[in-house]
């Protein structure tokens, strides 16, 4: 490994020879980042991306001004899927160093898991990785159950079984219980539900290549809520939380589900399948039914659910939906505290009725007459939340993954959302 490039911070502008827009300058001592007080964390992250682009793979964050948030901003921009990078961190106090180390361990796990090829990460592997991560930080405070394949059908998890049955890799439901109280009768404070589609071809409503080539990342919601629970535990979460991951491949085969199929759920709802590429809501429904049965104060589901959310927000914000204004406000406050981007999109009672079917209570996709795709998807999910008007948040994870690099991020997963959900759980 070459000698480390020193990276220092300055509140003074760069020498005029670097140009009036210069955010960093280079001299014999290393690289100086010139902070302007307007968006220092963003500036550090963008500069780190440029430094990585120069091929510099070993750096030392040196001098005054570095704290955990600034170190983390640098790492978010510096990390990329290919190659090895080494950072020598500055001296931080014990609390800040522990916070940074936990982010590096858990959010890097989220990014690396989302970036993993689908060939390496099937439904069972995703569930087991989640168990391993949370067990590592929680120890014997965790119990879990994994249900897969035909056992899902026999136990009534018809959405998950239907979507996953077309793959040779069995669909899996992970039900994990983090209970720090030691009391088996302790109330459940929150339930987290994640969409874990480890590859999404679209099924018989097949995707074009340009829309399928990033679908190893369609389990981003599951990775995000797993990371959020693990991170909340490192921050001292002392309440009981349950995690439900709905994991499957959505593939084409002689046994795959088809348009016109009708799924009957355990809560009695019948759903007509009119788009096999709207599979995420079908698997989440099973997880939300289980979550509702726990009678928690709060249910949070996370899913890379719709292209409509990305159309509205790009990859820059996660989309938030809720009927509960107070709870939505709490999550947005958590996002602000953690410097993570969330934006609330509309969800109203009428969205719940914009999925009409001639053969069932619900259609799994909106018609051309109801084009608000992200809102109608949230409306669909609300039918599987017992008390949907209070205590439920739906996150459409549009900021989870980038197909191409931008000035702040490499291509691939971002890890955004983990800290916000953890903040809300521990508030």
Swiss-Prot record:
Major subcellular location class: cytoplasm
Cofactor: how and how many bound: Binds 2 manganese ions per subunit.
EC number of the protein: 3.4.11.23
Location within or outside the cell: Cytoplasm
Record keywords: Aminopeptidase, Cytoplasm, Hydrolase, Manganese, Metal-binding, Protease
Keyword Zinc included in the entry's annotation: no
An individual GO BP term: proteolysis
Coiled coil segments of this chain: none
Positions contributing to Mn(2+) 1 binding: 200, 277, 279
GO cellular component: cytoplasm
Assembly and interaction partners: Homohexamer.
Protein's recorded name: Peptidase B
Protein source organism: Escherichia coli (strain 55989 / EAEC)
Gene from which this protein is expressed: pepB
